[in-house]
Amino acid sequence: MAGDLMNAATVLKIGQRVEFYLEDDDIRYTSRIEDITADRLIVAMPVDEKRRPIIPAAGEQLYGLAVGEACRYRFFSVFKGKARDPIPVWMITKPE
């Protein structure tokens, strides 16, 4: 049924494609889930059309969209930081 609430753990999986929108921005940035911890999602660092990395401000709100087996999962998250090894990634809060 449309609008049903689902737990993030049932939808989000390592390797899954996700799309992000930053606060006050309608540009879509594509990414992929690299790892999932108890409280964080580690996602590949998105790049813009010129292949420049997108790095939000710490604490910036993000809107995410992932397509699951039978649903489109929308969620809000917060940018916590970035890392570069072994690949450039964002560290964001894990939605509930």
Q: Each predicted region: which residue ranges?
A:
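Structured alpha-helical
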Residues: M1-E96
